Each structure stands twice: as structure tokens, then as C-alpha cells.
């Protein structure tokens, strides 16, 4: 059984910055993964798996000076961005094979798009506090 909970959040100033950082990092990981897969597809190279992308774009990237900021957000958010990319790409490839209705290729996420969302799974250890707030990792207790 899968359970989904959607919450309307009312974050304060520092929490807004932490959430904006999470949105931005998830977008960057999604776009980098899409670029790697598109490069492999057009070049005829081996298709990078989600595990390979996770190692390259999340684990190793946190150790570099250029991407050290990706360590400031929960790793679950970044992993879910790669899972979303995997789902979108798998749907696209299945459509090319004819096993699904026709859909377009996954597109890069824009910084200017207002639709921003991240997912925290049960492994992210989010919880509802006794005061009714939502406790998110590396964000804090956010009013719901």
C-alpha cells in the first residue's frame, strides 16, 4: 500500500531559504541526469543507470568544491529527483517502442517555472510534531 500526504506549508524566512535550496538542488540533479542520458542516447553510448547517476551526481558531487552546496539538502530529495527522471525517461522509451501512448521526451526543468515540488519519503524521517507542525530534514519544523 502506498500512502501520499500533501501539505500546504507556511514556512518562515530561514525555512523558505532551505526549501528554495532543496528545490534548486533537485532541479540541478534532474537536469544533469537528463543531460547525461541524452548525451548517451544521441552518442550511442551505454545507458547510464539510476545507480550510476546517483553515485556521480549526488555522492561524488558533494565531495567537489563546485557542488558542495548539494550537501546542504536532504539526500532523499536528490534521490527522488533522479527517480522522477527515471520514470519520465522510461515512459518516453516505452512510447518509442510502442508499448505506451506516445509522449514527448523529458524536458529540462526551468529555474523560472513556478511549479516547484520535492518529495520526502518515509526514509527521510519526516514527521508531524505534537504541535501539529511538519518536521522536515535539513529544513526544520514548518507550520502546516
PLM feature spans:
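Nucleic-acid substrate recognition interfaces
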Residues: 1-144
Amino acid at each position: 500500500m502506498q500512502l501520499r500526504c500533501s501539505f500546504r506549508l507556511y514556512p518562515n524566512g530561514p525555512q523558505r531559504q532551505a526549501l528554495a535550496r532543496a528545490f534548486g538542488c533537485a532541479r540541478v540533479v534532474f537536469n544533469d541526469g537528463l543531460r547525461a542520458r541524452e548525451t548517451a542516447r544521441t552518442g550511442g553510448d551505454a545507458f547510464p543507470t539510476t545507480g550510476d547517476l546517483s553515485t556521480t551526481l549526488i555522492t561524488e558531487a558533494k565531495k567537489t568544491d563546485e557542488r558542495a552546496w548539494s550537501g546542504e539538502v536532504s539526500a532523499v530529495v536528490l534521490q527522488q529527483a533522479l527517480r522522477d527522471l527515471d520514470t519520465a525517461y522510461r515512459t518516453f522509451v516505452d512510447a518509442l517502442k510502442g508499448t505506451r501512448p506516445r509522449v514527448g521526451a523529458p524536458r529540462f526543468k526551468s529555474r523560472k517555472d513556478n511549479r516547484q515540488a520535492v518529495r520526502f519519503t518515509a526514509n527521510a524521517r519526516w514527521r508531524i510534531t505534537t504541535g501539529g507542525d511538519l518536521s522536515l530534514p535539513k529544513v526544520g519544523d514548518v507550520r502546516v
